[in-house]
A protein has these predicted regions:
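Surface loop/turn motifs at the tips and blade-to-blade linkers of beta-strand repeat domains
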Residues: 42-47, 87-92, 132-139, 188-192, ...
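Bacterial N-terminal signal peptides
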Residues: 7-18
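Beta-propeller domain segments
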Residues: 23-34, 144, 161-164, 171-174, ...
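Asp-box/WD-like beta-propeller blade repeats and closely related beta-sheet repeat scaffolds
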Residues: 100, 112-150, 158-162, 185, ...
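Beta-strand-rich domains and repeat architectures in extracellular enzymes and scaffolds
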Residues: 41-67, 272-278, 294-295
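Acidic, glycine-anchored loop motifs typical of Ca2+
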Residues: 79-85, 122-124
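Hydrophobic beta-strand segments that make up the repeating blades of beta-propeller
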Residues: 53, 60-63, 105-108, 155-157, ...
């Protein structure tokens, strides 16, 4: 066995320290900075590592907790802005992540399958799930699977790559798949998307938008993470290209890169954009309506940490503007007390944010008082 000694050991320790997520710090909810008139409060806590959310037809908030194999319902029936209790809707699932309510069912994307639970308005506990997709590719990295439904009633599932950078053996990796709601008719919808953790449809144009996490180990500032408008049949570059058609140093194919689809928005490298939502509520000022909000989970392999915040991308006529900070303060120096994951508009018009480090769901509201 080879032992690390002297300067080599010091170098290895320094590298590992630089590549770790920001260190844990005690929660400081009051440290969050928001635009004037906005306020953030804890909606629910003690959830372990909550990830993706969905709002039921009754207005109840549901969240996945993959580490516990659970889907949790968080009703706020009295409308006071706090979950009255946390109710386990489903348990014993295999790393459930994405959630979607559609035509009398709650669909759940597990790491290797899609299941659905019968749902009636007001339900807070689920029955026996039905498996609708049995064979999503698994193994390797990027285990999350996210699900949404399009205006035409099709089901879309994002599947990340199995690696940092490689040529996949299974074409369903680093892709978005399309199915009928019953799981039939599965096919590739778009490719070359390294890890689209978040997917959603634009409420006005009907276009599919996605976050995409770029590859690692090319420095602090490259490649950028991306927001994509996902077109049917398009290829978005990975693993051959990064950013805006820049050939990869390991697997680059310059001629092919010229044919790939361009991103709609680029974000600071290693920010780790996860959930995204177009604001459709009536609580925020008019200038926020229709804008895109994105949760940046935060870097783990950058010498100076970045992310750990919520950004707003103004939308004008369906065209994205320059990203701007909306909620910051989870990162304090080199310490982070939380990591934002998903963002969603609640029935009350507030913006809800999940945090898988602090184990909380936050509620961001606006008031002129």
């Amino acid at each position: 066995m080879t032992l690390f000694r002297g300067p080599l050991l010091a170098a290895v320790v320094a590298l590992l320290a630089a590549c770790a997520p920001a260190a844990w710090a005690p929660a400081e909810e009051g440290a969050i900075q928001l635009p004037p008139g906005f306020r953030m409060d804890t909606f629910a806590s003690g959830l372990g590592a909550p990830r993706f959310m969905a709002v039921s037809p009754s207005g109840d908030l549901f969240v996945s907790v993959p580490s516990r194999g659970q889907i949790v319902a968080l009703p706020d029936r009295d409308g006071r802005g706090k979950a009255e209790r946390a109710i386990i809707f489903a348990d014993g699932l295999k790393r459930p992540h994405g959630l979607a309510f559609f035509r009398g069912f709650l669909y759940v994307a597990e790491t290797g399958a899609v299941v659905r639970f019968p749902y009636r308005p007001g339900d807070l506990t689920g029955g026996k799930p039905e498996v609708v997709v049995r064979d999503l590719p698994g193994g390797g990295g990027h285990w999350t699977r996210t699900i949404t439904f399009g205006p035409g009633g099709k089901m879309y599932v994002s599947v990340g790559s199995s690696c940092n950078v490689c040529e996949e053996r299974d074409p369903r990796r680093a892709a978005i798949l399309q199915f009928e709601p019953d799981g039939s008719g599965g096919r590739l919808f778009a490719r070359g998307i390294r890890n689209a953790v978040g997917i959603t449809f634009h409420p006005g144009t009907g276009e599919l938008w996605a976050t995409d996490n770029g590859r690692d180990w090319l420095g602090d500032d490259f490649p950028p993470d991306r927001i994509l408008v996902v077109k049917e049949g398009a290829h978005y570059g990975w693993p051959y290209c990064n950013g805006r058609r820049v050939p990869d140093p390991d697997l680059g194919r310059p001629d092919f890169c010229k044919t790939t689809a361009l991103p709609a928005v680029e974000i600071q490298a290693h920010s780790a954009p996860l959930g995204l939502t177009f604001y459709t509520g009536g609580m925020f000022p008019a200038e926020y309506r229709g804008d895109l909000f994105v949760g940046l989970h935060g870097s783990w392999n950058r010498s100076v940490q970045t992310g750990y915040k919520i950004i707003r991308i103004p939308m004008r006529g369906g065209t994205p503007g320059v990203p701007e900070d909306f909620a910051t303060g989870w990162l304090q120096g080199s310490q982070a007390w939380g990591r934002p994951v998903d963002v969603i508009t609640g029935k009350d018009g507030a913006l809800y944010v999940s945090d898988d480090r602090a184990g909380r769901i936050y509620r961001i509201a606006y008031s002129t008082r």
